[in-house]
Structures are given as structure tokens and as C-alpha cells.
């Protein structure tokens, strides 16, 4: 029988729209932007399942909840990708590459993939603890998700040989086996607004470049006509 550890007393330490299962399960499921998949995932054997909409605070909550339960060793990313945020790809990039000194997720393609409240230590703990990240992004077939969960539970490798790590999401500090955690107020709506502002800015820059090109083309054309007229007058004056 697999060796298990008790998760943090307040697990899951970060609030969210989660459905909880057996805390001794070795599988956690992230359903990204989809709805109606979480209960089926838990019924199939997941420790918890819930959505993740944003590539910053949303992912921070995932990290906090996973590393505070040493039993979770597999992470399944399923459900529809969140447009603009590209949260699923950002989670994979975090697991595979970690974060830079500026808190940015290395290789992430989302709009604002920065860990403001999570430092390198919790991210590295997640990378040690999770032995496999299963990519089912854009899969909403509950049978396929359930099959992936059962495949993971059949390979249960025991809990990681470390104590639960609880992260203060406001201070970014990691504490082993403590109970307190706090949130910095951020909303998915604000992150979406920032993402849209970034897109608008990029479109404005593209429009400015096109206008600059067109302006240069038009000015060059006028100059060419003027030079042609001057040369024509000069030639006729010499005849």
C-alpha cells in the first residue's frame, strides 16, 4: 500500500471553485475554462478538481494547493483552453521551465504570466513533487479524463518525502506545515482587461507602422513626380 502523508490542516489552502475528493489520492485535475467536469474527475479518483482561468493568481492558487498536499504526484490539465490567458500552456511552462528572477513564467505565452506572490522555492517544490504533467488541454470528454486519472492512480508512487508547504500568497513566503494563508485581491476580469489592453496596444503599433510606410511611399511618389517635371523642363529648355 502506498505511503501517505496528511495535507496541511487547512487544505486546500487557497479558495476557489474546487470539488474535493480523497486527499490521499495522487492526482490533481485542472479543468481550465470548462464547467461540469470536476465532479466526474473526483468520482474517477482525483484528490481535487477545479478550473483555472488566469495565468497569474489562478496558477498561484494551483501551486499553493498542490504543494500543501504531499500526496498529489500527478497533475492533469484538461478542459478548454482559456483564450487570451492561455492558462493551460502557462501551467505546463511553469512545470517544465520554472520562473525567472522577475517572476515571469519561462516560455509562457499568456498575456501576463507572472508569479507576483509565488517565489522560486514553491515552484521548485511543485516541480519535485509532480512527477508527471498530463496534457489533456481542450479535452472535455469525461471518459478520457477518467481514464487518465485511473492510469495515474494505478502508478501511485507514495507521497513526496517532504512536509506540506503552505504559501502566503500575499507575501510570497513558503512555510512548511503551517496553517495561515492570505490572498491579494485580484480578479479574472482585471487580468482579462489587461490582456485586452495589451492586444489593443499591439494593434495600434501595427497600424502606426502601416501608416508610416504609406506616408513614406506617398511622399516618395510626390518627390519622384517633382524630380521628373524638373528634368523634363530642363531638357526642353536645352532644345
Curated annotation (Swiss-Prot):
Record-linked Pfam families? MtrA (PF04208)
Its EC number(s): 7.2.1.4
Q: Which residues lie on this side of the membrane: Cytoplasmic?
A: 1-215
The main enzyme category here is translocase
GO cellular component terms?
plasma membrane
Which keywords annotate this record? Answer: Cell membrane, Cobalt, Membrane, Methanogenesis, Methyltransferase, One-carbon metabolism, Transferase, Translocase, Transmembrane, Transmembrane helix
Keyword rRNA-binding recorded: no
Record topology, Extracellular segments: 239
Topology relative to the lipid bilayer, per the entry, is: Single-pass membrane protein
Where is this chain's protein located in or outside the cell?
A: Cell membrane
Q: Which residues form a coiled coil?
A: none
One GO term (biological process):
methylation
Q: What job does the chain carry out? A: Part of a complex that catalyzes the formation of methyl-coenzyme M and tetrahydromethanopterin from coenzyme M and methyl-tetrahydromethanopterin. This is an energy-conserving, sodium-ion translocating step.
Similarity-based family: Belongs to the MtrA family.
Q: What is this protein called?
A: Tetrahydromethanopterin S-methyltransferase subunit A
Q: Which gene encodes it?
A: mtrA
Amino acid at each position: 500500500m502506498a505511503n501517505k502523508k496528511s495535507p496541511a490542516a487547512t487544505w486546500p489552502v487557497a479558495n476557489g471553485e474546487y470539488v474535493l475528493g480523497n486527499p490521499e489520492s495522487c492526482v490533481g485535475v485542472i479543468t481550465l475554462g470548462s464547467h461540469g467536469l470536476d465532479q466526474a474527475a473526483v468520482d474517477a479518483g482525483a484528490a481535487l478538481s477545479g478550473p483555472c482561468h488566469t495565468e497569474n493568481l489562478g496558477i498561484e492558487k494551483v501551486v499553493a494547493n498542490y504543494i500543501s498536499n504531499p500526496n498529489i504526484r500527478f497533475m492533469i490539465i484538461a478542459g478548454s483552453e482559456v483564450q487570451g490567458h492561455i492558462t493551460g500552456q502557462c501551467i505546463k511552462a511553469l512545470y517544465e521551465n520554472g520562473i525567472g528572477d522577475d517572476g515571469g513564467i519561462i516560455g509562457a505565452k499568456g498575456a501576463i504570466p507572472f508569479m507576483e506572490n509565488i517565489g522560486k522555492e514553491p515552484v521548485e517544490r511543485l516541480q519535485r513533487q509532480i512527477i508527471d504533467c498530463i496534457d489533456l488541454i481542450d479535452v472535455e470528454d469525461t471518459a478520457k479524463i477518467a481514464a487518465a486519472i485511473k492510469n495515474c492512480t494505478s502508478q501511485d508512487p507514495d507521497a513526496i518525502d517532504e512536509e506540506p508547504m503552505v504559501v502566503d500568497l500575499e507575501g510570497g513566503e513558503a512555510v512548511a506545515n503551517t496553517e495561515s494563508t492570505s490572498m491579494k485581491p485580484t480578479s479574472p476580469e482585471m487580468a482579462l482587461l489587461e490582456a485586452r489592453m495589451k492586444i489593443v496596444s499591439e494593434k495600434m503599433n501595427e497600424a502606426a507602422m502601416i501608416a508610416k510606410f504609406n506616408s513614406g511611399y506617398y511622399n516618395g511618389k510626390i518627390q519622384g513626380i517633382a524630380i521628373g517635371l524638373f528634368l523634363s523642363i530642363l531638357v526642353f529648355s536645352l532644345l
